[in-house]
Amino acid sequence: MEMLKAEVKPAVGCTEPVALALACAKAKELLGEEIVENRMLVSPSIYKNGMCVGIPGTERLGLKIAAALGIVGGHSENGLSVLETLTKEEVKIAEDYMDNTPLSITPADTREKVFIEVVLKGKNHIAKVRIRTKHDNFTFLEKDGEVLLDNEPKVSASNDAAEKAESLMDTVTIQELIKNVEEIDFKDIEFLLDGVKMNEEMAEYGLKQKTGIGVGYGIKKSIEEGLLGNDVINYAMMLTAGASDARMAGVKMPVMSSNGSGNHGLTAILPIVAYNKKFPQSDERLAKALAISHLVTGYIKNYTGRLSAVCGCGVAASTGATAGISWLMNGTEKQIEGAIENMIADLSGMICDGAKAGCALKLSSAASAAIQSAIIAKQDCFVPPLNGIVGSSVEQSIQNLGRVSDKGMSITDEIILNVMNDMNKVD
């Protein structure tokens, strides 16, 4: 329950630039005066994911406008919804601020996945803020040399071990997670249904008109024209892509996130919603399927890292969704584990080249694979042990996926960032 409440929460805007906006808002609040100098360091993963994505309330893209919005009108007490209350006037002021004020945002020399440091200087004061391990986790606050908060994690030189050290996922099995969910009182997880409403509303926005690159809208039109069938897989693709189209375009609406990511939330929730629309279940069963999805997503992220070179929607959140769907299908233990391993065998190589409009394509593929993996597992069709990176147990398969995603693709992540930098010429 503690993990669900900590990792499933509303967010407005792509989580990486929102995290920078949150840090900037906090630093400005600490400073308490006009800013004359700024310096921002972000981990390469934050830098990559914030480079090309739309920001709610403005047509501009990227980290600089997110930082400006946080400085001008952000309220840190709103957490990952820090940009939700900005007025049109504040957005215009932030855009002018960005145009007329040098904003220093550079990649930090760190292997941590989630690291943000903001230093703001005024005429009389200086404020420093750090966020580490999680997008809304303030670990260090300082004003004029006085340390107000020091909760810095110990992070190894090679990975984000601080985040992993917090997790209980190393000691439980997938079946233990599922059994725990089955025993939870419905009232304790009823809040998960709020995510259904939020994420469906974002999907509806992206399906009403061509938003972003219009992946969801294109699937919807193709279903209406008879080019695609109105089956559960295409419906899941349409819903999930439509929501991502809108979110990546910067539509100012909240979504329910999962494990620090709004797109993870879309992928962990909407394929299950699509299955539930076609094959209705009780609210209690739907909530428990969502709980399984979020927890399996977190289980996988424990090994792959919160941010990595692989698409977390493709390898983690969609795998959580397939587990939830398989459970809704009354799958046996073997079938649920088989659905998970089908996903690992399918989408494990999908790269993450930052948050952007094209994410809708990846979420569409992830939603399709999630439904497909659960459907064929229900027919006892799954990848056998010791086949590729699929191990002798589902837990070993997930650990193998983590090794490939974290250690195996660290150089890939560097190259992706270099390629994006060369094209975008971001300072």
Curated annotation (Swiss-Prot):
Superkingdom as given in the UniProt entry: Bacteria
Gene Ontology biological-process annotations: L-cysteine catabolic process to pyruvate
A molecular-function term among this protein's GO annotations: L-cysteine desulfhydrase activity
Coiled coil feature spans: none
InterPro entries in alphabetical order: Ser_deHydtase-like_asu, UPF0597
Record family assignment: Belongs to the UPF0597 family.
Name the UniProt record assigns to this protein: UPF0597 protein CD630_32320
Source organism: Clostridioides difficile (strain 630) (Peptoclostridium difficile)
